[in-house]
């Protein structure tokens, strides 16, 4: 491993597909980068990832490890790994940035790439978190194919803070779920006021089943596979579903957007400008789930490479300006 430079071209916060792809782009053009890896990933409950050519239905853990191995073997002269989280990030004195890791060590970089991902806000329903990623799916592009031919699927309307949005999602996911299951039930979790909502009545008219009863808990059969999830209702009744669909709200992982004063989108993601995904603060880029609404591995890879390219172009511009002053 080469000696760490006193100042890196980029400090990459996050070692998921976005951060690793950004590092790869930087390594290809001989830029130095430090990658901060907490080892915590949103898709940890999932055994497989999808829609990634040559890696479809394979382990996300194996994918990340292969990326890290490739970077270590081919680009160890410029790409450095720090197996620690980041405590803070701030602007330095000379148009650079300073990261303090969780061990108290400081790192300096010309640019920053946020690839921190997001955290899912789990609804306050007993058993939901345990079933998440196993029988409750937020994305049917990611998980639907493996459920094809199912007898039933349930759509959950749970988040009291965004109920109207949850109904819109249920309408969209309901029709999408029909591509994988024969019977669809919409669970309103006690929100009987939506029984008269034109969107719900429209689903009912099209053959969807509507269950307005409050949900007490969710359980699932771990064995044998394929099993089913059971929605337990407060009146004591139960409904078995081949799988459940719900997209919870997400929050940015870490306080770094706030520390840097970055603008956010209405959805709470970091606001960026294509094609290089620079944020509202010059020299700070964002990639992956924290920066795009479509939170999938392929998007993380794409935006990571774009952000890495953006860092190179800005560094190149500064290097050219410095050389011109010497001539």
Swiss-Prot record:
Q: Does the keyword Ribonucleoprotein apply?
A: no
TM region positions: none
The record's listing under Pfam families reads: Pyr_redox_2
What pathway, per the record? Mycotoxin biosynthesis
EC class: oxidoreductase
What the record notes about the co-factor is: Binds 1 FAD per subunit.
Keyword Magnesium attributed: no
Q: Name one GO biological process term.
A: cellular response to toxic substance
Which keywords annotate this record? Disulfide bond, FAD, Flavoprotein, NADP, Oxidoreductase, Redox-active center, Virulence
GO MF terms listed in the record are: oxidoreductase activity
InterPro entries in alphabetical order: FAD/NAD-bd_sf (IPR036188), FAD/NAD-binding_dom (IPR023753), Ferredoxin-NADP_redctase_2 (IPR050097)
This entry's comment on induction and repression of expression is:
Expression is co-regulated with the other genes from the sirodesmin cluster and corresponds with sirodesmin production.
Q: Where does FAD bind?
A: 15-18, 37-42, 50, 115, 289, 296-297
Q: What is its EC number?
A: 1.8.1.-
What does the record give as cofactor? FAD
Name the cystine pairs.
139-142
The protein's superkingdom reads Eukaryota
Q: Which family does it belong to?
A: Belongs to the class-II pyridine nucleotide-disulfide oxidoreductase family.
The UniProt subunit note reads as follows: Homodimer.
Summarizing the function annotation, the protein's role is: Thioredoxin reductase; part of the gene cluster that mediates the biosynthesis of sirodesmin PL, an epipolythiodioxopiperazine (ETP) characterized by a disulfide bridged cyclic dipeptide and that acts as a phytotoxin which is involved in the blackleg didease of canola. SirD catalyzes the O-prenylation of L-tyrosine (L-Tyr) in the presence of dimethylallyl diphosphate (DMAPP) to yield 4-O-dimethylallyl-L-Tyr, and therefore represents probably the first pathway-specific enzyme in the biosynthesis of sirodesmin PL.
Protein name per Swiss-Prot or TrEMBL = Thioredoxin reductase sirT
Q: Which gene encodes it?
A: sirT
């Amino acid at each position: 491993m080469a000696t760490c430079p006193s100042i890196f071209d980029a400090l990459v916060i996050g070692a998921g597909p976005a951060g690793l792809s950004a590092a790869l782009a930087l390594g290809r053009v001989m830029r130095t980068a430090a990658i901060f890896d907490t080892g915590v990933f949103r898709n940890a409950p999932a055994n497989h990832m999808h829609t990634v050519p040559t890696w479809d239905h394979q382990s996300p853990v194996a994918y990340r490890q292969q990326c890290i191995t490739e970077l270590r073997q081919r680009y160890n002269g410029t790409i450095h790994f720090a197996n620690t989280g980041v405590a803070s990030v701030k602007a330095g004195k000379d148009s650079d940035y300073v990261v303090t890791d969780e061990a108290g060590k400081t790192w300096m970089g010309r640019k920053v790439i946020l690839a921190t991902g997001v955290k899912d806000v789990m609804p306050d329903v007993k058993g939901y978190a345990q079933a998440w990623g196993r029988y409750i799916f937020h994305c049917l592009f990611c998980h639907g194919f493996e459920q094809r031919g199912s007898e039933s699927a349930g759509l959950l309307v749970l988040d009291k803070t965004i109920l109207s949005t949850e109904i819109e999602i249920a309408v969209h996911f309901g029709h999408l779920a029909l591509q994988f299951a024969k019977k669809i039930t919409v669970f309103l979790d006690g929100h009987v006021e939506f029984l008269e909502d034109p969107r719900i009545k429209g689903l009912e008219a099209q053959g969807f089943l509507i269950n307005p009863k409050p949900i007490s808990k969710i359980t699932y059969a771990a064995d044998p596979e394929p099993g089913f999830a059971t929605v337990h209702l407060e009146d004591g009744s139960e409904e078995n579903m081949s799988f459940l669909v719900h997209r919870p709200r997400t929050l940015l992982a870490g306080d770094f957007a706030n520390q840097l004063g970055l603008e956010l989108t209405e959805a709470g993601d970091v606001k960026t400008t294509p094609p290089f995904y620079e944020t509202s603060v010059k020299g700070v880029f964002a990639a992956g789930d924290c920066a795009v609404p479509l939170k999938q591995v392929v998007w993380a890879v794409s935006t990571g490479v774009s952000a890495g390219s953006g860092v190179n172009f800005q560094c190149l511009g500064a290097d050219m300006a410095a050389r011109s002053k010497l001539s």
